[in-house]
């Protein structure tokens, strides 16, 4: 018998159990949003003490790291760690974890998120208002200090980097959509069926740019859409000196806005 997929949301967390207090706040934000509704579930892949708390309603999928992944690419890590084990095993298997979560999902919409991302009030109403006609969706992402973080982003627009050397990443205005974008792996929404047909590359681990690889691949098949009615927010303060706050991203954003004003960038 074919599996019956219900209308609703599967929240797919990847976790390492490093800060379960923050993680618990993220889980609570989902329950607060869906209070009285049964069209959602919370799936967690990894290790966490929260999995033992039945009241949280988490469908836990155990996942043990490090993962056996021999590769010559690990040679630098092995030299730095002075450990042969690092040559054969890796931690940070976020692509693998997200793929596992998607396979376990019972609902037709997936919300992929890391264990420090929480829903702001009105998130579910915002998506209800936004509608269901999308394959990959994004909304505003805020850092804990309420500054905008990596959400709606340019990757390689030729108006910014004519040589397409992939160093033109920057935040974009929310009302502009192009075919040169990428989606953050920290948080994004996608349809289950679409994701299962376009899964993450499991050879890519944390820090390998798995979100960029996935974005560049799937943007050939669908248009990313922005939901202006919903917001998520980090429950801990993330890097405030790197992207999107650093000089490169800020400079690229100024170039993007200038090219937009000159008419060199048009929205789809």
Model-inferred region functions:
Residues 6, 105-108, 200:
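Active-site acidic short loop of glycosyltransferases
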Residues 7-12, 29, 41, 213:
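Cell-envelope/extracellular polymer assembly enzymes that use nucleotide-activated donors
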Residues 23, 176-177, 182, 204-268:
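C-terminal catalytic/acceptor-binding lobe
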Residues 25-39:
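Short, acidic, metal-binding catalytic loop of nucleotide-sugar glycosyltransferases
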Residues 46-47:
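Acidic ATP/Mg2+-coordinating residue in the GHKL
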Residues 51-104:
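Active-site-proximal specificity loops/subdomain of glycosyltransferases
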Residues 107-118:
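Short beta-strand-to-loop acidic/aromatic patch adjacent to the donor-nucleotide binding site
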Residues 120, 125-199:
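Conserved catalytic core of nucleotide-sugar-dependent glycosyltransferases
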């Amino acid at each position: 018998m074919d599996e019956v997929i219900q209308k609703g949301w599967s929240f797919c967390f990847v976790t390492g159990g490093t800060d379960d207090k923050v993680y618990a706040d993220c889980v609570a934000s989902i329950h607060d949003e869906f209070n009285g509704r049964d069209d959602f579930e919370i799936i967690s892949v990894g290790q966490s003490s929260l999995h033992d708390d039945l009241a949280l309603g988490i469908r836990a999928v155990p996942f043990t790291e490090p993962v056996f992944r021999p590769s010559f690419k690990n040679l630098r890590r092995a030299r730095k760690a002075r450990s042969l084990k690092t040559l054969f095993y890796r931690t940070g298997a976020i692509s693998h974890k997200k793929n596992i979560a998607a396979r376990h999902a019972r609902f037709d919409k997936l919300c992929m998120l890391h264990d420090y991302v929480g829903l702001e009030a009105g998130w579910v109403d915002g998506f209800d208002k936004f509608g269901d006609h999308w394959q990959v969706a994004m909304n505003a992402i805020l850092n804990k200090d309420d500054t905008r973080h990596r959400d709606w982003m340019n990757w390689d627009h030729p108006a910014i980097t004519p040589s397409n050397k992939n160093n033109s990443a920057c935040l974009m205005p929310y009302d502009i959509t192009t075919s040169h974008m990428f989606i953050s792996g920290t948080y994004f929404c996608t349809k289950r069926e679409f994701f299962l047909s376009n899964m993450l590359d499991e050879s890519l681990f944390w820090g390998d740019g798995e979100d960029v690889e996935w974005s560049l691949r799937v943007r050939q098949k669908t248009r990313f859409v922005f939901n202006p009615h919903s917001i998520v927010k980090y429950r801990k303060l993330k890097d405030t000196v790197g992207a999107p706050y650093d000089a490169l991203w800020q400079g690229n954003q100024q170039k993007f806005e200038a090219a937009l004003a000159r008419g060199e960038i048009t929205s789809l």
